[in-house]
């Protein structure tokens, strides 16, 4: 058996496979088929300062090779999570990353400070695909200066490892990655969903009330793979790669492209036990190819 352990942003992981935020709930929903303890890391669904009910109308829409979602960050809020969910989550003995979102810098900082004294947390994943209400709705993750300012404030507010989740909806994702590095981020996760939409030809109107939705699944894998390939060479930060991973071969591609770890998202809906087969598949691949550790193949596809 090969050594599957990795160190991602100072966080020891027993294997390189994590759950992607928003697709695995808080882990409890999948316990009948897979324990969060079996994952390299559990990344919980995104949390905001106050509870959110999410978007009205259609939330999910299948495409030919993926899934469009417009959930609207439905979540119980950070206080309810800390008081009611985290105590039970600790019992899972999982390496847990907390995904956080906010409408302005202060909200991100306040959420971070509320988590600082909590036990059972391995790190924070900062979702910068949120619109900044004080910057006319401009999404943090498309502007290097906004990204730098926000990540700097979060970094200064906690001793937890800070991982920043990057949006693909930018001209040059490496510029955003470099801003995160300058701000003191410990690691990066990429990519978030790709902006898209669908139209109901019978109603002759957009499927989603918000018009735009996030595309995930196999359709975005080539986009995600290229982003990981570019970013992992542009900065000296570990990368958690995600976007369309459905089998161990996909996961291996991301690691060869430079990812230290990978995260599974949409596949969890189609095949809840996918993580088990992907972890085993990575192990089998390493043995077959003669590698002692998964770390030995990281970035081998670089040219």
UniProtKB/Swiss-Prot annotation:
Domain of life of the native organism: Bacteria
EC annotation from Swiss-Prot or TrEMBL: 1.3.1.14
Residue sites binding substrate per the record: 45, 69-73, 127, 192-193
A GO CC term assigned to this protein in UniProt: cytoplasm
Functional pathway: Pyrimidine metabolism; UMP biosynthesis via de novo pathway; orotate from (S)-dihydroorotate (NAD(+) route): step 1/1
PROSITE patterns per record: DHODEHASE_2
InterPro entries listed in its UniProt record: Aldolase_TIM, DHO_dehydrogenase, DHOD_1B, Dihydroorotate_DH_1, Dihydroorotate_DH_1_2, Dihydroorotate_DH_cat, Dihydroorotate_DH_CS, Dihydroorotate_DH_I
Localization annotation: Cytoplasm
TM region positions: none
UniProt-listed GO biological process terms: 'de novo' pyrimidine nucleobase biosynthetic process; 'de novo' UMP biosynthetic process
Required cofactor names: FMN
Note on how the cofactor is bound: Binds 1 FMN per subunit.
Binding positions (FMN): 21, 45-46, 99, 127, 165, 191, 217, 243-244, 265-266
UniProt xrefs under NCBIfam families: PRK07259.1, pyrD_sub1_fam
HAMAP family: DHO_dh_type1
Function: Catalyzes the conversion of dihydroorotate to orotate with NAD(+) as electron acceptor.
The protein's name: Dihydroorotate dehydrogenase B (NAD(+)), catalytic subunit
